[in-house]
Amino acid sequence: MKRILFLLFFVSQLAFADASKLVKENCASCHEDEGLNLISLSSMTYLTQSELMYVLQKGKMKQQASHLSIEEKEVISVYLAQNEVSGNMTGSFNYKCTRSIGKRDLKQSSSWPSWGYDNFNSRNQPNSNINADNVKSLKLRWSFGISSQDVRAQPIVIGEVILLSDSDSLHALNRKNGCTYWKFTSKARLRNAPVLNEIDGESIFLVDSDFEVYKLNLLSGELIWTSKIPIDYESNIPSASPVQSGKYLIVPISTFETVLAIDPRHECCKTSGGIAAVDTDSGEIIWTHRIEEKSKTLGKGLITRIEKFAPAGSAVWNAPGIDREDKRIFFGTGQSLQSPASNYSDAIISMNLESGEKIWATQTLKGDAYNMGCEIPGIKRLVCPEEKGPDFDFGASVIQSKNQEGEKILLAGQKSGWVFRLDINTGEISWKSKVGNGGTLGGVHFGMTTDNKNLYVPVSDRKVNRDYDNDAKPGLYALDFEGGDILWEYRLDDICESRKALHGEGKCSTGFSAAISMTNNVIFAGALDGRFSAHASEDGSKLWEFDTLRDFMTVNGMPAVGGSIDSAGPVIVDDWVFVNSGYSQHGQMAGNAILAFSLD
């Protein structure tokens, strides 16, 4: 605290103008360019000073900030984190529960124990009273404000307890009134959902941004053990949520080297996506699997004279699925980061749960090599791979289900706008169906849902920095399991002309990018424009809607606003639905609200 006060004095008395100059010289050219779809400087005022320092020292901006001294980084982080200076985010208090969590609290109602609800990633809650007839009676019961500008991590709910992440803290709240049972502070930022330990039902696992794995006592929040997953490079990140089957905690590995590649001095690219398996009892690392073989030099760039490397990329952005019976893991991968593109990018991969060995890999798009340098004029000719995209990776979790004959199948949606059904044993594509135009931020982005008869697909189709062959088709789509035929579609109307971010300068966009969820005959979907809605699974018609682009009074006293709904999907338990609002990445509308709804 004394150091922060000193820095505030330093900035205000000695170098406010210099701080502004540092930001202008080092940050503004990219973060004030609307065409790059990056978080705006004004939206960064929702970040804390410690979060900004993490980004500059260890995160996505480490390469770009490498020429700055530690003092300059601290000045920039304090200057940008105006909320800590001006008090915009002050006033939070600890609304503590009057008692601790009891074992009965964990078992007396239904749960949503992981990112995809179950290990098949169905995102379908079978134990809820919400249906098409009563969903219109949903009311907002409470809201919780976090200290960041993105509500990125999806909550999970275990009985009467909801677990939600806030920067480097995990909060255990009462799901009916939002009071706090306990709070656990991690060593680094929390980007993803925790997962319930299915063996004892009384502990949870979470993974921070530095690949520190924690096992916590769910009743008390006390640490049981911590473990560290070895990674090849600091640019590897655990973006997607972990999943569990028995003694195996499966942790997906991604990479933000796509951002580092915008620096022509960077030796692009060496990182790879991967999977790690951690023993749920001891925390020991059972195995790790790198998707790509070790990168090899391709020689030096003709202009930069910097060495280039491949293969690289194939990040795992989605929570894997697990077939416990056949001891298999399944997941999708991202694009390659350097040409030549590999055979494992933009692919669905099946892997042995016990050994971590690949069983099969089905690539749906060849030649997709792309990094963020491809979007920056003046730099892209130096750093963009020869194949130049189109960046159509798999961001959404792969779903396992069964066809009419009772045979296991896999269902996958891609940013290209294509949806695929695959044979679970061979990876052979049974059918594919085009539901969206696709794009860097388009097509199917974060997650689908199913009732084991039809597949329900959200489409973003947000246009970004390139021309497209067809008009965008943002909306919801229902596909038949057997042939992939589109049964119905709900097109999302564009209302962005009348909408403006409540914090920062993020832009409104039209589309369903966040994962969707369902229960009974109702589908819940959050939109990039901030609307949260319920739709009939029979025909897609809208049954209920709540506009989250507003200010909220929160149970923890933290001022909160809603914004774009992206990434994390709705969580449904009994008569309750929980949703995050606020996502400033890609130049979208910042926000910091977690909202709790229930039936009257």
Predicted regions and their residues:
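Beta-propeller blade signature
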Residues: 271-284, 344-357, 472-484, 591-600
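Blade/loop signatures of beta-propeller domains
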Residues: 96-141, 296
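Extracytoplasmic electron-transfer domains, predominantly the class I c-type cytochrome c fold
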Residues: 29, 38-85
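Detector for the c-type heme attachment site
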Residues: 28-37, 57, 117, 424
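Surface-exposed loop and turn segments in beta-propeller and other repeat-based domains
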Residues: 228-233, 286-310, 358-389, 434-439, ...
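Repeat-blade elements of multi-bladed beta-propeller folds
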Residues: 109-116, 148-169, 187-213, 234-267, ...
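Sequence/structural segment immediately N-terminal to covalent heme-attachment motifs in c-type
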Residues: 17-33
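Short loop/turn segments that connect beta-strands within beta-propeller blades
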Residues: 174-177, 217-220, 279-282, 353-355, ...
